[in-house]
Regions:
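C-terminal catalytic "cap/lid" subdomain
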Residues: 1-229
Length: 229
């Protein structure tokens, strides 16, 4: 199976706070799956690092385009952490555009990137890479157990185990979430996945073994899928 793995900023926040054990466990899990024949394309989110730097730059009067550039640079720093952890299994640099990503992927190494274009989330980057590579599955490792019918901190919030693209769009339109807290999935990424009918499994990033469970099709997190599947 070819998998696009989006490692959300939450994971790198944990690494910054707690040390390298979590990212090391991610590498073990990815390489274990790789030995079983699964291919990985990896995208790193920005997390608190990006939010902090964007906040400082905003207070200094930086333009939105500069804020976008700062966010991209922070995701690339996190990508370098993942590359360092993967060692010689990884392509040595995070590609900065899709053409370079595809060329790097053909090297047979595990390619890790951050953001690509201003105004585009790493969700959208992962979705486009999934489309370019004809990935069988996109997995998003995030700070929640999956998609809920409302904010997960609200009383009575229920995890949705399976949801169609259209239902996901409805939830996005009905609920608003503060940036950097609970993140469902970027609507642009959702549209990209829908047009290519690529399923996305959204799971909690606290346990790297969730990657294997998602690949195996186990009932974990939330599966976002097309009506034709």
């Amino acid at each position: 199976m070819r998998v696009t793995l989006l490692i959300g900023g939450y994971v790198f926040d944990r690494v910054a706070q707690e040390g390298t054990e979590l990212i090391t466990e991610y590498v073990r899990t990815i390489l274990e799956a790789n030995k079983k024949g699964h291919e990985f394309a990896i995208v790193a989110g920005g997390g608190k690092l990006a939010r902090d730097y964007i906040g400082i730059a905003r207070s200094l009067g930086a333009s939105k385009s500069v804020l976008d550039d700062i966010g991209i640079l922070c995701t690339r720093l996190n990508a370098y952490l993942m590359i360092s952890a993967l060692g010689d299994k990884a392509y040595p640099h995070p590609p900065s555009n899709y053409r370079d990503y595809l060329s790097a992927f053909l090297s047979g190494k595990i390619v890790v990137c951050g953001g690509m274009s201003p105004g585009q989330s790493t969700d959208a980057v992962a979705a486009l890479i999934s489309e370019y590579l004809h990935s069988d599955l996109m997995i998003k490792m995030t700070s929640a157990e999956g998609v809920y019918d409302r904010h997960p901190k609200e009383t009575g919030a229920k995890l949705i185990p399976k949801i169609t693209y259209s239902h996901a769009r409805k939830i996005i339109s009905e609920y608003s979430y503060d940036p950097g807290t609970y993140e469902l999935i970027d609507p642009i990424a959702l549209k990209i996945l829908e047009r290519s009918n690529i399923p996305c499994r959204i799971v909690h990033g606290k346990d790297p073994k969730n990657i294997l469970k998602a690949i195996e099709g186990r009932n974990i997190g939330t599966l976002v899928y097309g009506e034709s599947r």
